[in-house]
Amino acid sequence: MRNTFLEFEQPLAELENKIEQLRYVQADSAVDISDEIGRLQQKSQNLAKEIYGKLTPWQTALVARHPQRPYTLDYVREIFTDFHELHGDRMYADDQSIVGGLARFNGSACMVIGHQKGRDTKERAARNFGMPRPEGYRKALRLMRLAEKFRLPIFTFIDTPGAYPGIGAEERGQSEAIGRNLYAMAELKVPVICTVIGEGGSGGALAIAVGNAVLMLQYATYSVISPEGCASILWRSADKAPEAAEALAITAPRLKDLGLVDRVVNEPVGGAHRDPRVMARLLRRALGDALRQLQGLGPEQLVDQRLQRLMSYGRFQEVRA
């Protein structure tokens, strides 16, 4: 699949086009131009490092939404084995924007749950562009309860622009479903490890992100509202999205500094979509580290650790008059 380049990556796109053209020339002639191709590839690598070394928060948001970025099922295929998907909330329907099921991580049984956006138009429509309805969150909660019953660790993967705001979703109790998940996840007596792999959009993300450990990929985002939504409210114009992204502190390093995420998982040069397999290996290592740190804790200790983590959120500065 050809790489899709974002607007700020156009210098990279031009270099990649040159490399592609040279490959065609080499294939059709006896002239050896492999040295020139190698030089351009090195130049492309250096340029990618330069561009990605100084991304703005808004550019990071664009990378987090990249259409070729790995989704939950991509990581499931690379990191887990024996995945068996489970369907339905046992109350209304099966929401395909959230996927989940039993799997094995490093040979041990676990539960995997995550948002899924879809690759093509048909799949995106079926998965509602990764925006869950109430039945999606209720399915996730059902699987978490199942994992707790059998004492299985839970891995969740967050990648959603937000919960679906449609009339039907509201009629079926969208806010109740999200709130119940927050309440229930705080009291689960098994290890819960959450990873923001793309967009972490508000309550739609948080509903499967209450964990003992919260990881975040280097170019993922996590916020209470999208930059465009914030700009539309504050400045009455979505054109101010870059300014809003800066003010919202949506990037992984900022959120790590604020204590909202525990670990930032580095991505390959150019983002996870440039080398999904390398990204999966890096994430697998981080998930293994997080699970090892929690395996010595008993059920009550896991709950206490999770609650202490939640209670530590927020900062304030006392100023004397």
From Swiss-Prot:
PANTHER family: ACETYL-COENZYME A CARBOXYLASE CARBOXYL TRANSFERASE SUBUNIT ALPHA, ACETYL-COENZYME A CARBOXYLASE CARBOXYL TRANSFERASE SUBUNIT ALPHA, CHLOROPLASTIC. InterPro entries: Acetyl_CoA_COase_a_su, ClpP/crotonase-like_dom_sf, COA_CT_C. Keywords: ATP-binding, Cytoplasm, Fatty acid biosynthesis, Fatty acid metabolism, Lipid biosynthesis, Lipid metabolism, Nucleotide-binding, Transferase. It is found in: Cytoplasm. GO terms for molecular function: acetyl-CoA carboxylase activity; ATP binding; carboxyl- or carbamoyltransferase activity. Gene3D superfamilies: 2-enoyl-CoA Hydratase, Chain A, domain 1 (3.90.226.10). One of its GO terms (biological process) is malonyl-CoA biosynthetic process. Pfam families: ACCA (PF03255). Pathway: Lipid metabolism; malonyl-CoA biosynthesis; malonyl-CoA from acetyl-CoA: step 1/1. This is Acetyl-coenzyme A carboxylase carboxyl transferase subunit alpha. Acetyl-CoA carboxylase is a heterohexamer composed of biotin carboxyl carrier protein (AccB), biotin carboxylase (AccC) and two subunits each of ACCase subunit alpha (AccA) and ACCase subunit beta (AccD). Residues 39-293 form the CoA carboxyltransferase C-terminal domain. It is an enzyme of class 2 (transferase). It comes from Bordetella pertussis (strain Tohama I / ATCC BAA-589 / NCTC 13251). Its EC number is 2.1.3.15. It catalyses: N(6)-carboxybiotinyl-L-lysyl-[protein] + acetyl-CoA = N(6)-biotinyl-L-lysyl-[protein] + malonyl-CoA. NCBIfam families: accA (TIGR00513), AccA_sub (NF041504), PRK05724.1 (NF004344). The gene is accA. It comes from the Bacteria. GO terms for cellular component: acetyl-CoA carboxylase complex. Belongs to the AccA family. Component of the acetyl coenzyme A carboxylase (ACC) complex. First, biotin carboxylase catalyzes the carboxylation of biotin on its carrier protein (BCCP) and then the CO(2) group is transferred by the carboxyltransferase to acetyl-CoA to form malonyl-CoA. The lineage of its organism: Bacteria, Pseudomonadati, Pseudomonadota, Betaproteobacteria, Burkholderiales. Signal peptide: none annotated.
